[in-house]
């Protein structure tokens, strides 16, 4: 277990396309969010689940369920909240990413430097599977206040250690770690790739 990093799982999405709460969708005998938690528990004993309704995730033992500080529907709110709960670098992941490979997480943590360490896949940053330093808090607040509340815009204002797609494929050849679930069909499709 690694105590040099904390983990924050963002569970604040609305699951509109999923038609139900995807974080609680059961496959392989457990809710999706529990798959994410179990993958990441080997990296830190400090795992937080950030959501608008923290009581919903109290069933996950060893996780700390916390409420989003800001009352806005935006993933930057979860990142902002994370900055208040830790003083060390932290891994941020989406609750709808149940196929994360441990080797990829390990690679990211080992290569973390600057304000953020983020993979760039197919020309786009992957901010919901990345390592951040809590010092980014003020820049997040500025982005939200200036109505530039998107991860892609925020990243342009951060000092980022960019990891390449080639580096990602060296530890996750199918890039399954970056698959986020939006429909029940996604679960089946990505499950078949990951197993």
Swiss-Prot record:
Record's keyword terms, sorted: Cytoplasm, GTP-binding, Magnesium, Metal-binding, Molybdenum cofactor biosynthesis, Nucleotide-binding, Transferase
Lineage: superkingdom: Bacteria
EC number: 2.7.7.77
Binding site for GTP: 10-12, 22, 68, 96
Residue ranges crossing the lipid bilayer per the database entry: none
Stored InterPro entries: MobA-like_NTP_Trfase, Molybde_CF_guanTrfase, Nucleotide-diphossugar_trans
Cofactor: Mg(2+)
UniProt subcellular location: Cytoplasm
Biological process (GO), any one: Mo-molybdopterin cofactor biosynthetic process
Gene Ontology cellular component list: cytoplasm
Function statement: Transfers a GMP moiety from GTP to Mo-molybdopterin (Mo-MPT) cofactor (Moco or molybdenum cofactor) to form Mo-molybdopterin guanine dinucleotide (Mo-MGD) cofactor.
Domain description: The N-terminal domain determines nucleotide recognition and specific binding, while the C-terminal domain determines the specific binding to the target protein.
PANTHER family xrefs: MOLYBDENUM COFACTOR GUANYLYLTRANSFERASE
This protein's name: Probable molybdenum cofactor guanylyltransferase
Organism field: Hydrogenobaculum sp. (strain Y04AAS1)
Lineage: Bacteria, Pseudomonadati, Aquificota, Aquificia, Aquificales
């Amino acid at each position: 277990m690694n105590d040099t990093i904390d983990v924050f799982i963002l569970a604040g999405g609305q699951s509109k396309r999923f038609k139900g709460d995807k974080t609680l969708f059961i496959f392989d005998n457990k809710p999706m969010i529990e798959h994410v938690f179990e993958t990441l528990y080997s990296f830190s004993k400090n795992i937080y689940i950030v959501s608008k309704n923290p009581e919903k995730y109290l069933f996950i033992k060893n996780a700390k369920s916390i409420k989003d500080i800001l009352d806005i529907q935006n993933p930057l709110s979860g990142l902002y909240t994370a900055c208040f709960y830790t003083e060390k670098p932290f891994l941020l992941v989406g609750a709808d990413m149940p196929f994360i490979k441990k080797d990829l997480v390990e690679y990211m943590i080992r290569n973390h430097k600057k304000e953020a360490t983020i993979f760039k896949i197919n020309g786009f940053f992957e901010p919901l599977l990345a390592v951040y330093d809590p010092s980014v808090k003020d820049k997040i607040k500025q982005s939200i206040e200036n109505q530039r509340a998107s991860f892609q815009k925020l990243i342009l204002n951060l000092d980022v250690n960019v990891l390449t797609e080639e580096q990602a494929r060296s530890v996750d050849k199918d890039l399954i770690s970056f698959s986020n679930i939006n429909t029940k069909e996604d679960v089946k499709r990505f499950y078949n790739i990951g197993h």
